Swiss-Prot record:
Domain of life: Eukaryota
Gene behind the chain: MT-ATP8
Entry keyword annotation includes S-adenosyl-L-methionine: no
Role of this protein: Subunit 8, of the mitochondrial membrane ATP synthase complex (F(1)F(0) ATP synthase or Complex V) that produces ATP from ADP in the presence of a proton gradient across the membrane which is generated by electron transport complexes of the respiratory chain. ATP synthase complex consist of a soluble F(1) head domain - the catalytic core - and a membrane F(1) domain - the membrane proton channel. These two domains are linked by a central stalk rotating inside the F(1) region and a stationary peripheral stalk.
GO molecular function annotation: proton transmembrane transporter activity
Record membrane topology: Single-pass membrane protein
GO CC aspect terms: mitochondrial membrane; proton-transporting ATP synthase complex
Protein name: ATP synthase F(0) complex subunit 8
Stretches with biased composition (Low complexity): 37-55
Main location: mitochondrion
Disordered as annotated region, ranges: 35-55
PANTHER family recorded: ATP SYNTHASE PROTEIN 8
Family assignment from sequence similarity: Belongs to the ATPase protein 8 family.
Origin species: Chaetura pelagica
Length: 55
């Protein structure tokens, strides 16, 4: 069964992970987010429960 032979597939997987880790990931992490996190506190609105007419 050729799919159980790890000879070509392990090398392809290893090469793809190394490509991702060494080339693609640093390029993606260098981008600045469009909405940086802020220290603003969130406001919670008080909601009233719905009154069901049949209860």
């Amino acid at each position: 069964m050729p799919q159980l032979n790890p000879n070509p597939w392990f090398f392809i997987m290893l090469l793809s992970w190394l490509t991702f880790s060494l080339i693609i990931q640093p390029k993606l992490l260098s981008f600045t987010p469009t909405n940086p996190p802020s220290n603003k506190t969130t406001t919670h609105t008080k909601t009233t429960p719905w009154t069901w007419p049949w209860t």
